[in-house]
Amino acid sequence: MNQLDLIKSSIKSIPDYPKAGIIFRDITSLLEVPEAFKATVDAIVAEFKDKGITKVVGTESRGFIFGAPVALALGVPFVLVRKPKKLPRAVISQSYALEYGEDTLEIHLDSVKENDNVLMVDDLLATGGTIDATAKLIRRLGGKVEHAAFVIWLPDLGGKERLEKEGINSFTLVEFAGH
């Protein structure tokens, strides 16, 4: 079995969770297979090791799981983007639209510097709303955002196209049809 097949086969699909009509892609099952988790991190690192990345940013919370080991392997700092009131130092905030309502993300003011070449990492690319808000935070701090990496891509939801319009190239490992 090749590495991408190992990764994909390690992700369990849960129908009708969290609501009817949704198929939830559960990365916790991937984390329970050390070879698949390592293959995931290794594939992202291989893609970005020669792109001059100076920071890796992970978005709460599953972006932390994959982003931190990627940053460690690349030898660069790892930066957290979190929900409001979770970061202790001075922050900036960015709101973004959800299917029904709005949410907000925050980043420490001193986490990204002018001209940092930032790789954003998250577990899943669906509509792209969360990672687009993350990119806006990074850019407001002067960072350069041209790359994002995801374990899972749901192509039917338009996230990759949304990010392309913002000048962000998406690297994805496996894709699943549907929601």
Curated annotation (Swiss-Prot):
Q: What's an example GO BP annotation here?
A: purine ribonucleoside salvage
Q: What is its main location?
A: cytoplasm
Output the SUPFAM superfamilies linked to this UniProt entry: PRTase-like (SSF53271)
Q: Where in the cell is it found?
A: Cytoplasm
PROSITE patterns in alphabetical order: PUR_PYR_PR_TRANSFER
Cellular component, GO, one term: cytosol
Q: What is its EC number?
A: 2.4.2.7
Picking any one GO molecular function of the record gives: adenine phosphoribosyltransferase activity
**InterPro entries reported for this sequence:** Ade_phspho_trans, Adenine_PRTase, PRibTrfase_dom, PRTase-like
Query: What is this enzyme's class at the first EC digit?
Result: transferase
Q: In which pathway does it act?
A: Purine metabolism; AMP biosynthesis via salvage pathway; AMP from adenine: step 1/1
Reaction equation(s) it catalyzes: AMP + diphosphate = 5-phospho-alpha-D-ribose 1-diphosphate + adenine
- The entry's keywords: Cytoplasm, Glycosyltransferase, Purine salvage, Transferase
What this chain does, per the entry, is described as:
Catalyzes a salvage reaction resulting in the formation of AMP, that is energically less costly than de novo synthesis.
The similarity comment for this entry is:
Belongs to the purine/pyrimidine phosphoribosyltransferase family.
On subunit structure and binding partners, the annotation says: Homodimer.
List the protein's name: Adenine phosphoribosyltransferase
Q: Which organism is it from?
A: Actinobacillus pleuropneumoniae serotype 5b (strain L20)
